[in-house]
Amino acid sequence: MQQYSSKYNKQAILLVNLGTPDNYDTKSIKRYLKEFLSDPRVIEANPILWKIILNLIILPIRAKKNIHTYKTVWNKQHNKSPLLFYTENLADKLDKKLDNYIVDYAMRYGNPSIESKIKSLQDQGATEIIIFPLYPQYSATTTATVYDEVYRVLSKLRWQPTIKGINPYYDNKFHIQTISQQIKEHLKKLDSTPDTVLFSFHGLPKEYFDKGDPYYCHCYKTYRLVKEELQNEYPNIDFELSFQSRFGPKKWLEPYTTVKLEEFAKQNKSVVIIAPGFSADCLETLEELAISEKENFIKKGGKEFSLIPCLNDSNQHVDMLYNIIDEEICLKK
């Protein structure tokens, strides 16, 4: 009987994040936004009408508008967006921690693509690939579309690898403990105790939730579990929930982060804000929260504004992902 090389019996873990433009020029941003906003999971609209609106109105305007915002947060030392930089480092660190697995990363939109990385992992001998979407809270607009793309890629392969997936980890004990500890460590660094810790999650059109998307419930449970971990130790801090990054005229999940921050500002409160739905810092945290929302908050009378960084490529994040993977698939030691 023919002996096959042991090369073709490896397991791999593919971390998947949202995506980023290749650069902060108009062409790169437009290409990225077109792929992202053309996904029917993201924008539920008449496809013909939406294509016209997207190409004639939204892309020309938003591509130019976003040049400055991307340039503001871009990691110019490595010529990468923060999201790409941190996700790449995170995969490298996890790869070093997992001797018996190949660990790599991909982006749902932009580069490196899921298709290119599945091919790369197969070329390295992976016959089983564990997909790990880096979204703690499930949504059809994020987690589901990752698997849509994975299975689209598989449909073209003659030799398909076995695919397994890591569940959303919005209520996983390792995730809750890590976020709670992250907040504690940040609070210790402050000169005074803030009035409020605001949990700001990326928003979602309310109609998506009404149709059955569990995202709001997952966000609320993450918020509630972390709050329960902290409220006894910090009885004088209010813990609140909000949603950011609203896009378009439709009603989105409420309360809106902008509205909550303006309310706190009018009361001359000090605020610490954390965005636990983002695994790595990106435009929504480094520009929208750290710059735009902070400026508006201070302008409206807010006292102190402090943003907790995402877990990024920290050792705590690596350990958390390791423990979640181990809990789900019993890692080979």
Curated annotation (Swiss-Prot):
GO cellular component, one term: cytoplasm
Keyword Cytoplasm tagged: yes
Domain of life according to the entry: Bacteria
Amino-acid biosynthesis in keyword set: no
GO BP terms: heme biosynthetic process
Chief location: cytoplasm
Transmembrane segment boundaries: none
Keywords tagged on the record: Cytoplasm, Heme biosynthesis, Iron, Lyase, Metal-binding, Porphyrin biosynthesis
InterPro entries reported in the protein's UniProt record: Ferrochelatase, Ferrochelatase_AS, Ferrochelatase_C, Ferrochelatase_N
Swiss-Prot/TrEMBL catalytic activity: heme b + 2 H(+) = protoporphyrin IX + Fe(2+)
Pathway field: Porphyrin-containing compound metabolism; protoheme biosynthesis; protoheme from protoporphyrin-IX: step 1/1
Family in the record: Belongs to the ferrochelatase family.
PANTHER family in the record: FERROCHELATASE, FERROCHELATASE, MITOCHONDRIAL
Name of this protein: Ferrochelatase
Organism: Francisella tularensis subsp. holarctica (strain LVS)
